[in-house]
């Protein structure tokens, strides 16, 4: 048996000591991670106990989001002040899209909007839309034959609504209609503009996630995001799907663009043009599958 020299023995000891040092450091790091995790869970539980939404009729909703690592900060149960106007804008989208875009983009308070090349039906729809927007104090207008003379009175809240919230209102209408067409007996609740914060966050004034709509059924939740612009924001809805979707609960992105929903499978993206029928079909598939 070959003997090792004192120098070699010293080298072996140093190598073993280095390995032990690495293991000790890894164990210490793991203990720190476990300590941080335990602390986060403690904070989350304290916040859960203080959160009012676990003590109301929203307990089921609060439990769902807590299971995903979030607490409810706030939500809107009503349909919103401009719900009917949002439905109207979407109903005449062929003419309202261009008009609203022009209204938002105009740098002048007063401008002329020519409507001579649109159909009579579209002209009537645009006229009715202007009447309703005038009632909401968003604009004033007068007509000269087929031209609209517009005086913009848009405020910040109006711009926010016309830039996207109006399509959320239309979305809600289509979603609720699809549910009622699917079943007159099914119970559900709709929550608008749901604000969430991470359960272990100590910042009471900050929300980490905003959700357009959450539909609550007895045993599942469907979360809806509305994309009114041309940018798909793929990273956002992929992240949200991973956060909230599972076998029963779904995250659904509704877009103004027209496309084949199968393009984005397994993620659920539905064009608003066919949202009502697409969502009704999804309900039929999901609820039928749960019965077997």
Describe the residue ranges of each PLM region:
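N-terminal nucleotide-handling cores and adjacent loading/scaffold lobes of large enzymes
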Residues: 1-2
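Intrinsically disordered, low-complexity Ser/Thr/Pro/Gly-rich regulatory segments
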Residues: 6, 15-292
